[in-house]
Regions:
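Residue-level signal for mature regions of secreted extracellular proteins and peptides
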Residues: 13-14, 49
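Short, conserved catalytic or interaction motifs in soluble domains
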Residues: 22
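Bacterial N-terminal signal peptides that target proteins for export
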Residues: 1-10
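Periplasmic OmpA-like peptidoglycan-binding domain that tethers envelope proteins to the cell wall
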Residues: 143-215
Length: 215
């Protein structure tokens, strides 16, 4: 009888050990699913190419009409807003060309009855000289113009003085005089019509025409 109690006690100890062994093991935590990648952006390359091409067409038209400043600004817009397009790839060279033509053909203006070079005109002529040093085969005709006040003969002479003043300034910057030709038109070719101070101011000028060389 004592042996049976001992056997029961032996069985009871493991059962108590199992019952008191602590909390059950926690279930493994399932990892959260990885976030899905966003869908790729729609392919708008054709639209970007078309938009850039339209701006380039406007730039080409501006170049053809001699509005080099507008052409340059349009090409810079393409380079800024539509990088990677065919038009943007070609833009840097065309911008350089437009900038050179803009400098070479920029006109200068004079005060009433004067042929002296103002500070503003000097800055324009200095940029012109830089372009001429880069494009060594370019030659220019310098035209002198006047407003309508004064006699025809007087304005012819004043126009020539203005053209020669521009020539003298350019040669003082080290450019060869053989690259230039001077001519006067007096009051015969006004830039602006009308007998107002604004029109007269625009007409007192020297124009620069490219007569040889490629840009």
């Amino acid at each position: 009888m004592r042996r049976s109690h001992k056997f029961a006690a032996v069985l009871l100890v493991p059962l108590l050990a199992v019952a008191c062994s602590g909390n059950p093991e926690p279930e493994p935590v399932q990892p959260e699913p990885a976030p899905q990648a966003p869908p790729p952006p729609p392919d708008d390359s054709a639209e970007r190419e078309a938009a850039a091409s339209r701006i380039c067409d406007r730039a080409s038209a501006a170049m053809e009409s001699g509005d080099y400043a507008t052409a340059r600004q349009l090409l810079e817009q393409v380079l800024r807003d539509y990088p990677g397009t065919a038009c943007a790839e070609a833009a840097p060279g065309e911008i350089d060309r437009a900038r050179a033509l803009e400098a070479l053909t920029a006109r200068i203006h004079f005060e009433f009855n004067l042929a002296s070079i103002s500070d503003e005109a000097a800055a324009i002529l200095q940029r012109k000289a830089e372009a001429l040093r880069t494009h060594t085969d370019v030659q220019l005709t310098i035209e002198g113009h006047c407003d309508e006040r004064g006699s025809l003969e007087y304005n012819q002479a004043l126009g020539m003085r203005r053209a020669r003043a521009a020539l003298q300034y350019l040669t003082s910057l080290g450019l060869d005089a053989s690259r230039f030709r001077v001519v006067t038109f007096g009051e015969e070719r006004p830039l602006a019509s009308g007998s107002t101070e604004g029109a007269w101011r625009q007409n007192r000028r020297s124009e620069f025409v490219i007569t040889a060389g490629d840009i």
